Amino acid sequence: MYKQLISEQRYAIYLGIKRGNSIRKIARAIEVQPSTVLREIRRNSNANGEYVWCNAQSKCMGRKHGLKGNHRKPQELWWRIDQMIIENDWSPAQIAGVLGKEGIHIAKQTIYNHVHADTSGRLRPHLPHELRYTRRVKALRPTKATNIANRTSIHERPAEADGKRFGDWEMDTIVDSFGHAILTLTERSTNFILMEKLKQGRKAMPTAKTVARLLFPYREHVLTITTDNGCEFAAHLEITRLLSIRGREKVTVFFADSYCSLQKGAIENANKLIRKYIPKKSNFDDFSDAKIMRIQKKLNARPREKLNFDSPKNCFFMHFY
């Protein structure tokens, strides 16, 4: 006898299909006959023959209420969207993009409206556009360009290092009011982030060794590095030496013009994202290495519109396979 499925069972069918499970295995999991699962898939798949849980639920509810083309979103979808906002800090555009790749079509403005209609106030603080960034002022003023020996200007950087080529990096530090610093690096084409607390503050030689250690596993894919004129990067020739590969052109560190943060926009944007989790008034002593690594992993798993809503991690490591 045919039994009407509920939303949770449809979601289990959707997950089972995505995992490649057989119809019989899916049927056993939700305690129905295989014929019920087959009927559900045939009846509620989309025009491309894909079975998507929330679309299937909407079609069922539309038939149930006699509303042809009913486009109301099931409550389960809103619960999932809430989790994406609260747990992952994803923007409506990122959520709409990721759901769209799953065949679930929802406009980012619809998600914004949902957030603004939330009377509990739980959702709004997690939206990126709710953050208010002021212009970053470092505890120590940038070193004048003339004080960095053997400095190579950004104006000598090759034209192909335009942010589209894989292997061009930017680096910077974020600081607190207690003299602590965190090194940040990003690969420009994928926005992949590396970060680590600097145990000796902004001393040039220890900073150079940390940069080289973080980039060493990927040194074959380090073509250029761009940074500002901070005193912590004065030992840039040590970075070049430590990342050198015999028979290949040496990695050059290029320095932006003083007070021209737009010349290294990728790392500036990365730092803003990091500040979501490490606010400016923080004491970095409160952030363990493990906690900083969790922040790095979270940002690298975050979908980006620039990457067609893929993650920096996926786009970065596809170059190694």
PLM regions and their residue ranges:
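Short, basic alpha-helical/linker "hinge" immediately adjacent to a nucleic-acid-recognition surface
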Residues: 1-89, 93-98
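Acidic/histidine-rich, metal-coordinating catalytic segments
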Residues: 220-235, 257-259
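Basic, flexible linker segments flanking DNA-binding modules
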Residues: 55-59, 106-161
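Two-metal-ion RNase H-like nuclease active-site motif
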Residues: 166-175
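Mobile genetic element proteins and their domesticated derivatives, centered on retroelements
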Residues: 13, 37, 81, 95, ...
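Charged alpha-helix within mobile-element recombinases
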Residues: 31, 82-87, 216, 250-253, ...
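Short conserved beta-strand segments at catalytic cores or DNA/RNA-binding microdomains
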Residues: 174-194
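Active-site beta-loop-alpha junctions of metal-dependent nucleic acid enzymes
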Residues: 175-178, 195-218
